[in-house]
Every structure is written in C-alpha cells, then in structure tokens.
Amino acid sequence: MSGFSTARQNMVDCQVRPSDVTDLRIVDAMLAVPREVFVPERQRALAYLDLDVEVSEGGSARRFLIKPAVIAKMLQAAEIKDTDSVLVAGCATGYAAVLAARLAGRVTATEVDPSLAAKAREVFVQLGLERVTVRAADPAEGDPANAPYDVIVLDGATEITPDRLYGQLKEGGRLVGVFAMTQPPRAMIVTHSHGDFGSRALFDASAPVLPGLERRPVFVF
C-alpha cells in the first residue's frame, strides 16, 4: 500500500468512522477518492490530516478543502440518492463534488476562483468523471439556470442566511453546510417543505467561510 493509500485508510479509520459516519457509500467513496490530487504539491503531506487544507495559490480569496469528517457527516445527513441532482457551492478544487458524484445522479459545482475551477475540471477528467460539471461562479449565487436541486452542499461555512440558495431547492430538497452565525458554529440541515424552510442542527463544526457568504461589516458612528 502506497503512502497516500495508507494515509487515506487512516483518515477513514481514525477520523471518519469514529465520527459516526455509517453510510458505507460515503466510507467507500472516501477510501476510493485520492484527496491528495485536489491539493497543491506543497500541501500534499497535509491532505489526509484533520485540517482545513488551503488549496488557493495567490487568488483573491483563500480557499480550502474542509476537514474530512465534516464533509463526510454533512453528506451523510443530506441522504443523497442516486437519482438526486446536487449542487456543491464553493467547491474549491472539487473534492466534495467528486464524493457527491459517487452518490448522486448529477452534480454541478461552483467556484469563484477561475483557476481553481479549471483545476477541478482537470481532476474530474483525470478521474474519468462524467456526471459532474463545474462553473466559475460565486457560491452565494448558486446555479439558478439549472435549479432546482434535490441537495445543495455548502463546501464551507456561511455567516449569513443563504437565501438565494434556499430558493434553488426542490420541494423536499435539503441544504447542508456549516452555519457560522451561531455560537458555537454548527453544521445544519435546511429542508424545503411546502414553501417553508426548516432547519436542524447536526453537530458542532467549524470551516472557512465561503466567498460571498461573509457577514457584512457593521459601521458604528
């Protein structure tokens, strides 16, 4: 077993499974998808650690792969079916989008940094994926042209209510992400039911805030 293969197994055994991830589809996906290919060469030694790993290289916004256990638990909570259409908002280099593609019927990913969106496309081709596409777009804007979606995954945190994304959920659709407007920050699931949006806390979590979903500064005079 290669060094990265061993690290991948250890990530699943020591981070993912102990975090109550019992969906074997997600476990199998995390064992199969090489997380290191989504990380710059200089950062690859960090790829499988319990860290938010920075993948941006000089762009206007710092971008990260969020902690493995956090994305695994959010995907499990979303209960993605093989017929579902999924939007991954703020995909960085595409790791969460690839995991989702192993669960869903169709995946669209958005990324604000064009160079990272291009990197994600390269990795998708490298891995032979045909059911996932990426667009260079603000995570907060979503993908209204192809909405509605069964599932929306925030590949990071939000400090504001992502109303535009709520509006892109199908009836019965689910949005999962880290909501940093609560203290402590928590992963949440929001469900669209009969025109209403109900939320439920999943677990305490932290993640870097996605571009466009930052809290607006308040000026006091």
Regions found by a protein language model. Give the residues of each.
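Conserved nucleotide-cofactor-binding alpha/beta core module
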Residues: 79-198
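Class I SAM-dependent transferase core
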Residues: 1-87, 95-99, 103, 116-126, ...
